[in-house]
Amino acid sequence: MKVREEIRLLRHGRDWRGRSTVPRTADPWVLEEEEREFPTAWARSRVAVMVRSGLQRRLLRPVTWSQTRPIVEGVEYLENLRAPAVFIANHSSHLDAPLIVSSLPRRFADRLAVGAAADYFFDARIRAAATVLFFNAFPVERHGSRRLRSLAVELLDDGWNLLLFPEGTRSEDGWMSAFKPGTAQLCVSKGVPVVPIALRGAYAAMPRGRNWPVPGRPRVSVRYGRPLYPAKGEGFRELRVRMMRAVARLAAEEEMGWYGALRADAEGSLALPGQAAAAGGAECRRIWESTRPLEPRPRRRVWT
Protein backbone atom coordinates (compact mmCIF):
# COMPACT_ATOMS: atom_id res chain seq x y z
CA MET A 1 0.00 0.00 0.00
CA LYS A 2 1.28 3.47 -0.89
CA VAL A 3 2.18 5.95 1.83
CA ARG A 4 -0.39 8.38 0.49
CA GLU A 5 -3.13 5.75 0.84
CA GLU A 6 -2.04 4.93 4.39
CA ILE A 7 -2.18 8.61 5.35
CA ARG A 8 -5.64 8.91 3.83
CA LEU A 9 -6.92 5.90 5.79
CA LEU A 10 -5.44 7.14 9.05
CA ARG A 11 -6.86 10.60 8.49
CA HIS A 12 -10.30 9.03 8.13
CA GLY A 13 -9.88 6.94 11.28
CA ARG A 14 -8.89 3.68 9.53
CA ASP A 15 -5.71 1.64 9.62
CA TRP A 16 -4.09 -0.09 6.64
CA ARG A 17 -6.52 -2.99 7.01
CA GLY A 18 -9.50 -0.65 6.80
CA ARG A 19 -10.37 -1.18 10.46
CA SER A 20 -11.37 1.62 12.79
CA THR A 21 -8.61 3.08 14.96
CA VAL A 22 -11.17 4.38 17.46
CA PRO A 23 -11.89 1.99 20.36
CA ARG A 24 -15.41 0.61 20.28
CA THR A 25 -15.86 1.67 23.88
CA ALA A 26 -15.65 5.28 22.69
CA ASP A 27 -18.61 4.94 20.29
CA PRO A 28 -21.23 6.23 22.78
CA TRP A 29 -19.28 9.49 23.10
CA VAL A 30 -18.78 10.10 19.39
CA LEU A 31 -20.74 13.17 18.35
CA GLU A 32 -23.29 12.58 15.61
CA GLU A 33 -22.68 14.47 12.41
CA GLU A 34 -25.11 17.33 12.04
CA GLU A 35 -27.37 17.30 9.01
CA ARG A 36 -26.16 19.69 6.35
CA GLU A 37 -28.39 22.29 4.79
CA PHE A 38 -28.99 22.00 1.06
CA PRO A 39 -30.56 25.17 -0.37
CA THR A 40 -32.76 24.16 -3.32
CA ALA A 41 -35.60 26.69 -3.19
CA TRP A 42 -33.89 28.88 -5.80
CA ALA A 43 -34.41 26.14 -8.40
CA ARG A 44 -38.19 26.55 -8.12
CA SER A 45 -38.26 30.24 -8.95
CA ARG A 46 -39.92 31.32 -12.18
CA VAL A 47 -36.60 32.13 -13.86
CA ALA A 48 -35.06 28.80 -12.85
CA VAL A 49 -38.09 26.90 -14.16
CA MET A 50 -37.77 28.63 -17.53
CA VAL A 51 -34.03 27.97 -17.73
CA ARG A 52 -34.47 24.33 -16.70
CA SER A 53 -37.23 23.74 -19.24
CA GLY A 54 -34.96 25.03 -22.00
CA LEU A 55 -32.01 22.94 -20.82
CA GLN A 56 -34.10 19.79 -20.67
CA ARG A 57 -35.65 20.25 -24.10
CA ARG A 58 -32.60 21.52 -25.98
CA LEU A 59 -29.75 19.76 -24.19
CA LEU A 60 -30.77 16.91 -21.89
CA ARG A 61 -33.23 15.18 -24.22
CA PRO A 62 -31.14 15.51 -27.43
CA VAL A 63 -28.03 14.19 -25.69
CA THR A 64 -29.89 11.31 -24.02
CA TRP A 65 -31.69 10.36 -27.24
CA SER A 66 -28.44 10.58 -29.24
CA GLN A 67 -26.69 8.09 -26.94
CA THR A 68 -29.58 5.64 -26.49
CA ARG A 69 -32.65 4.47 -28.43
CA PRO A 70 -35.54 4.97 -26.01
CA ILE A 71 -38.91 3.29 -26.51
CA VAL A 72 -41.55 5.20 -24.52
CA GLU A 73 -44.96 3.65 -23.89
CA GLY A 74 -47.96 4.34 -21.68
CA VAL A 75 -47.84 8.15 -21.72
CA GLU A 76 -51.54 8.12 -22.63
CA TYR A 77 -52.31 7.03 -19.05
CA LEU A 78 -51.29 10.53 -17.91
CA GLU A 79 -53.88 12.40 -19.97
CA ASN A 80 -56.48 12.67 -17.19
CA LEU A 81 -54.01 12.76 -14.29
CA ARG A 82 -54.21 15.80 -12.07
CA ALA A 83 -51.16 17.18 -10.34
CA PRO A 84 -49.58 16.84 -7.91
CA ALA A 85 -48.58 13.21 -8.36
CA VAL A 86 -45.69 11.00 -7.31
CA PHE A 87 -43.87 9.16 -10.08
CA ILE A 88 -41.96 6.05 -8.97
CA ALA A 89 -39.54 3.85 -10.90
CA ASN A 90 -36.99 1.11 -10.51
CA HIS A 91 -33.46 2.47 -10.22
CA SER A 92 -30.46 0.85 -11.88
CA SER A 93 -28.62 3.65 -13.67
CA HIS A 94 -27.89 7.37 -13.71
CA LEU A 95 -29.80 7.34 -17.00
CA ASP A 96 -33.08 6.74 -15.18
CA ALA A 97 -33.86 10.35 -14.28
CA PRO A 98 -32.87 11.82 -17.69
CA LEU A 99 -34.98 9.21 -19.49
CA ILE A 100 -38.05 9.90 -17.36
CA VAL A 101 -37.72 13.68 -17.30
CA SER A 102 -37.20 13.78 -21.08
CA SER A 103 -40.18 11.53 -21.83
CA LEU A 104 -42.72 13.17 -19.50
CA PRO A 105 -45.25 15.61 -20.97
CA ARG A 106 -44.08 19.15 -20.30
CA ARG A 107 -47.04 19.94 -18.03
CA PHE A 108 -45.60 17.41 -15.57
CA ALA A 109 -41.89 17.85 -16.30
CA ASP A 110 -41.99 21.62 -15.78
CA ARG A 111 -43.46 21.08 -12.29
CA LEU A 112 -41.33 18.09 -11.31
CA ALA A 113 -38.92 17.73 -8.38
CA VAL A 114 -36.56 14.76 -8.36
CA GLY A 115 -35.41 13.06 -5.16
CA ALA A 116 -31.63 12.56 -5.24
CA ALA A 117 -29.30 10.87 -2.76
CA ALA A 118 -27.97 13.51 -0.38
CA ASP A 119 -24.68 11.69 0.24
CA TYR A 120 -23.87 11.48 -3.49
CA PHE A 121 -25.35 14.40 -5.39
CA PHE A 122 -25.08 16.98 -2.62
CA ASP A 123 -21.58 16.26 -1.31
CA ALA A 124 -19.90 18.76 -3.67
CA ARG A 125 -21.13 22.23 -4.55
CA ILE A 126 -20.67 22.03 -8.32
CA ARG A 127 -22.37 18.66 -8.65
CA ALA A 128 -25.18 19.75 -6.33
CA ALA A 129 -25.77 22.99 -8.25
CA ALA A 130 -25.84 21.18 -11.62
CA THR A 131 -28.20 18.47 -10.32
CA VAL A 132 -30.56 21.02 -8.80
CA LEU A 133 -30.56 23.19 -11.92
CA PHE A 134 -31.16 20.38 -14.44
CA PHE A 135 -33.58 18.27 -12.41
CA ASN A 136 -34.97 20.53 -9.67
CA ALA A 137 -33.47 17.91 -7.35
CA PHE A 138 -33.96 17.87 -3.61
CA PRO A 139 -31.90 15.77 -1.17
CA VAL A 140 -33.16 12.41 0.06
CA GLU A 141 -31.39 10.51 2.82
CA ARG A 142 -31.03 6.81 2.06
CA HIS A 143 -31.79 5.92 5.68
CA GLY A 144 -34.46 8.52 6.28
CA SER A 145 -34.48 12.04 7.65
CA ARG A 146 -37.49 13.74 9.22
CA ARG A 147 -36.39 17.15 8.00
CA LEU A 148 -35.94 16.02 4.40
CA ARG A 149 -39.22 14.09 4.46
CA SER A 150 -40.97 17.30 5.45
CA LEU A 151 -39.45 18.94 2.37
CA ALA A 152 -41.19 16.37 0.14
CA VAL A 153 -44.48 17.16 1.90
CA GLU A 154 -43.95 20.88 1.34
CA LEU A 155 -43.28 20.31 -2.35
CA LEU A 156 -46.53 18.37 -2.75
CA ASP A 157 -48.41 21.05 -0.84
CA ASP A 158 -47.03 23.63 -3.28
CA GLY A 159 -48.29 21.61 -6.26
CA TRP A 160 -45.01 20.05 -7.37
CA ASN A 161 -44.90 16.53 -8.78
CA LEU A 162 -42.23 14.23 -7.37
CA LEU A 163 -40.02 11.60 -8.98
CA LEU A 164 -38.84 9.11 -6.37
CA PHE A 165 -36.95 5.82 -6.52
CA PRO A 166 -38.43 3.69 -3.70
CA GLU A 167 -35.54 1.20 -3.70
CA GLY A 168 -33.42 3.89 -2.06
CA THR A 169 -30.32 3.32 -4.19
CA ARG A 170 -29.20 2.14 -7.59
CA SER A 171 -29.22 -1.59 -8.14
CA GLU A 172 -25.79 -3.21 -8.15
CA ASP A 173 -26.82 -5.97 -10.56
CA GLY A 174 -29.71 -4.43 -12.50
CA TRP A 175 -32.43 -6.35 -10.62
CA MET A 176 -35.07 -4.61 -8.56
CA SER A 177 -34.95 -4.79 -4.78
CA ALA A 178 -37.84 -4.37 -2.35
CA PHE A 179 -39.22 -0.85 -1.97
CA LYS A 180 -38.61 1.09 1.21
CA PRO A 181 -41.83 2.20 2.94
CA GLY A 182 -41.17 5.95 2.91
CA THR A 183 -42.69 6.68 -0.50
CA ALA A 184 -45.86 4.72 0.26
CA GLN A 185 -46.18 6.49 3.62
CA LEU A 186 -45.88 9.85 1.88
CA CYS A 187 -48.54 8.99 -0.72
CA VAL A 188 -50.99 7.64 1.86
CA SER A 189 -50.57 10.62 4.17
CA LYS A 190 -51.10 13.14 1.35
CA GLY A 191 -53.63 11.10 -0.65
CA VAL A 192 -51.82 11.70 -3.94
CA PRO A 193 -51.79 9.35 -6.94
CA VAL A 194 -48.75 7.19 -7.69
CA VAL A 195 -47.62 6.64 -11.28
CA PRO A 196 -45.52 3.46 -11.70
CA ILE A 197 -42.72 3.48 -14.27
CA ALA A 198 -40.54 0.58 -15.37
CA LEU A 199 -37.20 1.08 -17.08
CA ARG A 200 -35.52 -1.74 -18.96
CA GLY A 201 -32.10 -1.64 -20.58
CA ALA A 202 -30.83 1.36 -18.61
CA TYR A 203 -28.46 -0.82 -16.58
CA ALA A 204 -26.98 -2.32 -19.75
CA ALA A 205 -26.68 1.15 -21.29
CA MET A 206 -24.96 2.76 -18.31
CA PRO A 207 -24.26 0.48 -15.33
CA ARG A 208 -22.61 1.44 -12.07
CA GLY A 209 -19.10 2.78 -12.55
CA ARG A 210 -19.76 4.45 -15.89
CA ASN A 211 -20.14 8.19 -16.36
CA TRP A 212 -21.41 7.93 -19.94
CA PRO A 213 -23.57 5.42 -21.83
CA VAL A 214 -21.86 2.55 -23.64
CA PRO A 215 -21.24 3.02 -27.38
CA GLY A 216 -23.74 1.86 -29.97
CA ARG A 217 -26.93 3.62 -28.83
CA PRO A 218 -28.37 0.69 -26.84
CA ARG A 219 -32.12 0.22 -26.67
CA VAL A 220 -33.89 1.25 -23.48
CA SER A 221 -37.58 1.18 -22.65
CA VAL A 222 -39.57 3.57 -20.47
CA ARG A 223 -43.03 2.22 -19.72
CA TYR A 224 -45.65 4.21 -17.78
CA GLY A 225 -48.50 2.46 -15.99
CA ARG A 226 -51.96 3.46 -14.85
CA PRO A 227 -51.94 5.78 -11.82
CA LEU A 228 -52.55 4.11 -8.46
CA TYR A 229 -54.80 5.92 -6.00
CA PRO A 230 -54.60 5.21 -2.27
CA ALA A 231 -57.90 3.57 -1.33
CA LYS A 232 -59.94 4.76 1.63
CA GLY A 233 -58.58 3.10 4.76
CA GLU A 234 -55.61 1.61 2.88
CA GLY A 235 -52.38 1.50 4.86
CA PHE A 236 -48.95 2.25 3.49
CA ARG A 237 -47.95 -1.42 3.63
CA GLU A 238 -50.76 -2.39 1.27
CA LEU A 239 -49.97 0.49 -1.07
CA ARG A 240 -46.28 -0.44 -1.04
CA VAL A 241 -47.15 -3.95 -2.25
CA ARG A 242 -49.39 -2.53 -4.98
CA MET A 243 -46.56 -0.23 -6.07
CA MET A 244 -44.08 -3.10 -6.31
CA ARG A 245 -46.54 -5.27 -8.23
CA ALA A 246 -47.28 -2.47 -10.69
CA VAL A 247 -43.61 -1.78 -11.47
CA ALA A 248 -42.79 -5.50 -11.68
CA ARG A 249 -45.72 -6.07 -14.06
CA LEU A 250 -44.63 -3.20 -16.31
CA ALA A 251 -41.07 -4.53 -16.39
CA ALA A 252 -42.31 -8.02 -17.28
CA GLU A 253 -44.21 -6.68 -20.29
CA GLU A 254 -40.89 -6.39 -22.12
CA GLU A 255 -40.71 -10.19 -22.48
CA MET A 256 -44.27 -11.34 -21.79
CA GLY A 257 -46.33 -8.64 -23.43
CA TRP A 258 -49.18 -6.78 -21.74
CA TYR A 259 -51.55 -9.71 -21.38
CA GLY A 260 -48.84 -12.19 -20.38
CA ALA A 261 -47.65 -9.92 -17.56
CA LEU A 262 -51.22 -9.27 -16.44
CA ARG A 263 -51.97 -13.00 -16.38
CA ALA A 264 -48.76 -13.80 -14.48
CA ASP A 265 -49.67 -11.18 -11.89
CA ALA A 266 -53.21 -12.55 -11.52
CA GLU A 267 -51.91 -16.12 -11.15
CA GLY A 268 -49.35 -15.07 -8.53
CA SER A 269 -46.40 -16.25 -10.62
CA LEU A 270 -44.97 -12.76 -11.07
CA ALA A 271 -42.06 -12.29 -8.65
CA LEU A 272 -42.05 -9.04 -6.70
CA PRO A 273 -38.93 -6.88 -6.40
CA GLY A 274 -36.56 -8.59 -4.01
CA GLN A 275 -38.08 -12.00 -4.66
CA ALA A 276 -36.99 -11.86 -8.30
CA ALA A 277 -33.41 -11.07 -7.34
CA ALA A 278 -33.34 -13.94 -4.86
CA ALA A 279 -34.57 -16.32 -7.55
CA GLY A 280 -32.16 -14.96 -10.15
CA GLY A 281 -29.23 -17.07 -8.98
CA ALA A 282 -25.68 -15.87 -8.45
CA GLU A 283 -24.84 -12.19 -8.76
CA CYS A 284 -22.75 -12.79 -11.88
CA ARG A 285 -25.73 -14.40 -13.60
CA ARG A 286 -28.03 -11.51 -12.62
CA ILE A 287 -25.53 -9.01 -14.01
CA TRP A 288 -25.27 -11.03 -17.22
CA GLU A 289 -29.05 -11.03 -17.54
CA SER A 290 -29.25 -7.28 -16.91
CA THR A 291 -26.54 -6.39 -19.43
CA ARG A 292 -28.10 -8.28 -22.32
CA PRO A 293 -29.20 -5.74 -24.95
CA LEU A 294 -32.92 -5.37 -25.47
CA GLU A 295 -34.06 -7.16 -28.59
CA PRO A 296 -36.34 -5.47 -31.13
CA ARG A 297 -39.86 -6.43 -30.13
CA PRO A 298 -42.00 -8.10 -32.79
CA ARG A 299 -45.67 -7.21 -32.93
CA ARG A 300 -47.57 -9.42 -30.51
CA ARG A 301 -51.20 -10.30 -30.45
CA VAL A 302 -52.79 -8.82 -27.34
CA TRP A 303 -54.02 -12.20 -26.09
CA THR A 304 -50.63 -14.01 -26.35
Question: Could you tell me what each predicted segment is?
Answer:
Residues 72, 87, 114-115, 222-224:
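Generic preference for hydrophobic
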Residues 71-76, 100-102, 149-151, 208-210:
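A generic local structural motif
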Residues 68, 110, 218-220:
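Residue-level signal for beta-strand positions within conserved beta-sheet cores that form or flank
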Residues 60-91:
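Helix-to-loop junction immediately C-terminal to a conserved catalytic motif
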Residues 62-68, 139-143, 173-174:
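Short, flexible loop segments at the rims of nucleotide/cofactor-binding pockets, characterized by
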Residues 44-67, 123-135, 207-217, 276:
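Alpha-helical membrane-targeting segments
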Residues 1-34, 39-40, 44, 51, ...:
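Non-catalytic C-terminal accessory region of glycerolipid acyltransferases
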Residues 79-143:
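Catalytic core of membrane glycerolipid acyltransferases/transacylases, capturing the structured
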